[in-house]
Amino acid sequence: MIVSRGAVLRAGGRQLSRVLGGARPTEHITEPSKGSAIRHKSSGPSDSGFCQFTAGIMPETVPMYPTLEKLGLLNAAHVRIKDLARVEELVSSLVSSGFSKLQVIADFDRTMTRVSYFGKLCDTCHGIMDNSSLMPAFYREEANKLLAKYYPIEIDPKMSEEEKIPYMIEWYNQIHELIIKCKVSQKSLEEMVSSSNARLRDGTRDLCKKLHEYGVPVLVFSAGMGDILEQVLRHFDVYTDNLKVVSNFFKYDEEGIVVGFEGDLIHMFNKNENAIHSSDYFDKLTGRNNVILLGDSLGDIKMAVGVPQPSNVLKIGFLNDKVEERLEAYMDGFDIVLIDDQTMDVVNSVVRLME
């Protein structure tokens, strides 16, 4: 989108933000010599999709959202942005501040990892265990029953977060009790991961490599199982020293058998920096008030709670299913929403601009 140099178009007080993708009528504004602008609307899409001023000759123009245009976000069919002006300002601030001011906070399952591959659902951390031949049949049966009962509650747009939390705690506690009954050994986890179909989202390895190169702290929050998550990171060779995992970790007995879980329960609605108790990690965050937050659920929006203020938090959300039902809520919560995107292309594009 472009406007004449020095002009800011508000269109009668309306902010020119739009849901991206899809044609719309083109609006032109003619500026007569006496100055009052006259609007003309064409009935179909223009070649450029731009809103432009005309006054006899084509004026010199500048982009209204230059950074978003560089990123290719203004015409991408899978991208939704509710407030273009705010996101332009956020991204521009992150880019101009550079890597030294940046930290990244990311969910893991279906954010750093793929949802599906060639039409088949990929394993999450829980799914790796659920689908492993090393687990007894009764575990898979019971785990599937719990999934069928509680997952619809997790994603129900008609329920508030406060209403969902008790059910999520019930779900996690029951799964954890099942795991303890199975007497899972620590040494079996590597085999579970290597035999699973878990895959990183395309471009995740490149993103992790670049963030490690520039020493950017990466905090991975997961309501899954931390021991399995760490095995996945090792398996794909992305578990670098700038990355910290906050999740539910197993407690083992002397023989390496799971007998419980360490610390407080992490579920999808209490993931935030207040859950971190490592002073060493917070030392790394000094002066890093710019955040790129990546998540696939509405609960992930709060992961940056606890970041020192003032801060600039760019929230990028992956909307993987039930798009029509959940799109409005995702656009309200995330700055950029990516629909059925199995890549890290948008995130990598932002990071490349910072170089």
Question: What does each model-identified segment do?
Answer:
Residues 241-283:
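Active-site-proximal segments of catalytic enzyme domains
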Residues 267-306:
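Conserved Lys-Pro-Asp/Glu-containing loop-to-beta segment of HAD-superfamily phosphomonoesterases
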Residues 332-355:
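C-terminal functional extensions of proteins
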Residues 220-223, 290-340:
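Acidic, Mg2+-coordinating phosphoryl-transfer loop and its flanking beta/alpha structural elements
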Residues 39-41:
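N-terminal mitochondrial targeting presequences
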Residues 51-254, 329-330, 334:
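Alpha-helical substrate-recognition element adjacent to the catalytic core
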Residues 1-12:
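N-terminal chloroplast transit peptides
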Residues 20, 24-25:
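Compositionally biased, intrinsically disordered low-complexity segments enriched in Pro/Arg/Gln/His
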